[in-house]
């Protein structure tokens, strides 16, 4: 019995109460008084089972209180800790900084009892009263396996006790003591493994409360910065779109979790908790109305919806069914509000499953919700740099300080496009969810198609931005080859025109000007264009044909674009109108310059016709050195030949020949 004594040293002092039928027709109750019966003589055979196991071995262990207060019957402590975890949360309690902490020592999850054995060395496998504890080498995890089947032990002990009733031998007491130990360990293991889903649920619930607090704290920082922002600039719009999308997704996750949890709740208790914490179900129905616009008012409405659903979710956890299905109190008014708020809910969907499986299902659902909430928190945490860039510009600040402050905004040009795409995605999701009537299908399909088209345009724009560098380089490499290039300003034959030998022309592309993301950066980088003077170029061969051309691209901007601050004050309509005027101005100047260059080249061709005869004579004469100018004349003839027979001058050459032929026929 030394091994049995060691085992009960591990168990410690347990005081529990139980009333059970071990033999079917007799109640077994163990009392704490000493047994005065002697081991040799048993006067009453029926008193064998009723006799407490005491003084089996003198001076070893007192087994009188072994079956007192078995905890497998009562779940009061679990429900109390569950209620304390929910009620003491900051979402239901405004004075949460005054709450009393719940230490692990006072929790039902404290399994670290006073164990004096195996403290000095690490054991890879330890037999305990809760099962066989094994340690994995690779994963470094502990695994608890059940080594006693409660039903088999119960049947075996019952059959042995039935045979021992007619046995009066001395060894009967020793056999009876071993049977009681095995029966007690079977009760303990059955209780623990039945309670394990509740322990897991309570752990996941506390983790969910922590994640909700983290998400709420970082979300409030975003809301505070939006409220103090005076002007909605580019960064403010990005914050608004990001916060709107994340808030909408979080509200939908809370909504679906609350709707699923209603199947496990007691509606009578839920109505009482909603009354205690001031949850207005009529207001909740108004906040669930579908919203198709993205405004500041809608954002605050979504925030109110999240606060309501968060409180409602905790009240649902407080009113979870706990073996009291007969104690339901029907509330017709409250059930009507629930049907309006959750159309998929019906009272027939209440879960009637076993108590243990109920907590395991809820634990699995909370794990999935915690993963989604962690993802939303990580998105807000990664973009928290946007919070510190919404300050408005002061008058004393210079343009250099402004560029330094908004420098990080242009590192990733696709960020705003991705935020817009995320907004379009959640609008499509909202349309799909809000379809209820058959009459609204056509209108809803049109709205969904519009959102999908906008999303496709955003994706194409994002792809064009990523591939703009490679396309630009390929376009310039193709100019170096032979062929007829139709763009006069970027023709490869410009190097033969003297007017382009001493100046450089740089323009703002129309595509770049139409891009709102790059327009501000272009203007802020070139803010000194008003101090540039025009450069005059005179063509010697045209005898005084002077014209003016600017060397800086920003000279084509209007006065309203001189300062970047004025640009940010323009609304969408004004910016679009200015942009159209700018495009028209560039088109007019481009057409004018093309006409001037075409006229200049035509004059050059007419002058080259007068030298055609001299060119033929130069070709017939093999000795170029006989001419007066010698080598210089040879180089000039080669230049004139290359200029005359270049691919770009061929159309003009045929036009002149047709003109001369028509003049001769007249």
From Swiss-Prot:
Transmembrane segments: 171-187
Subcellular location: Peroxisome membrane
Entry's Gene Ontology BP terms: peroxisome inheritance
Chief location bin: membrane
Keyword Zinc-finger: no
Keywords from the UniProt entry: Glycoprotein, Membrane, Peroxisome, Receptor, Transmembrane, Transmembrane helix
Record membrane topology: Single-pass membrane protein
Glycosylation sites: 227, 414, 464, 471, 512, 563, 609
GO CC annotation: peroxisomal membrane
Organism domain of life: Eukaryota
Ranges in a coiled coil: none
Function according to Swiss-Prot or TrEMBL: Required for peroxisome inheritance.
Family: Belongs to the INP2 family.
Protein name in UniProt: Inheritance of peroxisomes protein 2
Protein species of origin: Candida glabrata (strain ATCC 2001 / BCRC 20586 / JCM 3761 / NBRC 0622 / NRRL Y-65 / CBS 138)
């Amino acid at each position: 019995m030394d091994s049995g004594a060691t085992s009960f040293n591990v168990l410690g002092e347990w005081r529990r109460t139980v009333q059970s039928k071990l033999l079917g027709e007799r109640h077994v109750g163990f009392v704490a008084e000493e047994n005065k019966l002697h081991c040799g003589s048993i006067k009453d055979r029926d008193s064998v089972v009723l006799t407490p196991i005491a003084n089996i071995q003198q001076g070893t262990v007192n087994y009188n209180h072994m079956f007192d207060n078995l905890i497998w019957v009562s779940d009061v402590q679990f429900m109390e800790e569950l209620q304390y975890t929910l009620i003491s949360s900051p979402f239901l309690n405004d004075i949460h900084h005054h709450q009393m902490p719940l230490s692990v020592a006072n929790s039902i999850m404290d399994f670290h009892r006073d164990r004096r054995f195996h403290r000095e060395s690490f054991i890879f496998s330890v037999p305990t009263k809760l099962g066989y504890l094994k340690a994995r080498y690779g994963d470094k995890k502990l695994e608890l396996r059940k080594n006693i089947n409660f039903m088999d032990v119960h049947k075996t002990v019952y059959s042995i006790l039935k045979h021992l009733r007619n046995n009066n031998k001395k060894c009967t007491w020793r056999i009876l003591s071993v049977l009681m130990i095995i029966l007690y360990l079977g009760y303990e293991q059955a209780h623990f493994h039945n309670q394990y889903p509740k322990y897991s649920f309570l752990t996941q619930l506390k983790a969910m409360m922590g994640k909700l607090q983290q998400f709420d704290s970082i979300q409030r920082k975003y809301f505070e910065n939006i409220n103090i922002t005076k002007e909605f600039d580019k960064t403010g719009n990005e914050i608004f779109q990001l916060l709107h999308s994340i808030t909408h997704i979080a509200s939908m996750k809370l909504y679906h979790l609350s709707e699923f949890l209603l199947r496990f709740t007691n509606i009578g208790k839920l109505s009482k908790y909603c009354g205690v914490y001031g949850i207005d179900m009529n207001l909740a129905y108004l906040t669930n109305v579908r919203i198709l616009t993205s405004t500041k008012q809608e954002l605050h409405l979504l925030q109110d919806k999240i606060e309501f659903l968060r409180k409602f979710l905790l009240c649902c956890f407080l009113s979870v069914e706990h073996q009291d299905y007969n104690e339901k109190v029907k509330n017709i008014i409250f059930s009507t509000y629930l049907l309006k708020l959750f159309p998929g809910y019906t009272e027939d969907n209440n879960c009637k499953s076993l108590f243990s499986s109920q907590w395991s299902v809820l634990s699995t659902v909370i794990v999935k919700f915690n993963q989604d909430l962690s993802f939303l928190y990580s998105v807000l945490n990664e973009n928290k740099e946007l919070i510190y860039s919404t300050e408005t510009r002061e008058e004393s600040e210079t343009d250099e300080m402004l560029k330094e402050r908004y420098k990080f905004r242009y590192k990733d040009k696709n960020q705003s496009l991705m935020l817009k795409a995320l907004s379009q995605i959640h609008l499509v999701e909202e349309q799909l969810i809000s379809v209820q009537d058959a009459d609204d299908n056509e209108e809803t399909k049109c709205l969904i198609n519009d959102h999908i088209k906008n999303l496709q345009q955003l994706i194409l724009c994002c792809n064009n931005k990523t591939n703009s560098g490679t396309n630009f380089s390929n376009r310039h490499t193709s100019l170096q080859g032979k062929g007829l290039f139709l763009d006069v300003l970027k023709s490869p034959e410009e190097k033969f025109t003297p007017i382009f030998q001493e100046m450089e022309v740089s323009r703002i592309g129309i595509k770049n000007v139409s891009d709102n993301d790059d327009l501000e950066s272009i203007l802020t980088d070139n803010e000194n264009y008003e101090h540039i003077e025009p450069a005059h170029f005179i063509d010697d061969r045209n005898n005084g044909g002077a014209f003016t051309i600017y060397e800086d691209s920003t000279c084509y901007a209007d006065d309203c674009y001189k300062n970047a601050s004025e640009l940010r004050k323009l609304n969408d309509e004004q910016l679009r109108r200015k942009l159209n005027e700018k495009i028209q101005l560039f088109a007019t100047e481009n057409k004018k310059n093309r006409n001037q260059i075409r006229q200049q080249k035509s004059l050059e061709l007419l002058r080259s016709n007068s030298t055609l005869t001299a060119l033929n004579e130069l070709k017939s004469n093999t000795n170029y050195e006989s001419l007066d100018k010698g080598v210089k004349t040879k180089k000039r003839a080669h230049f004139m030949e290359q200029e005359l027979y270049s691919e770009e001058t061929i159309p003009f050459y045929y036009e002149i020949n047709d003109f001369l032929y028509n003049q001769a026929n007249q």
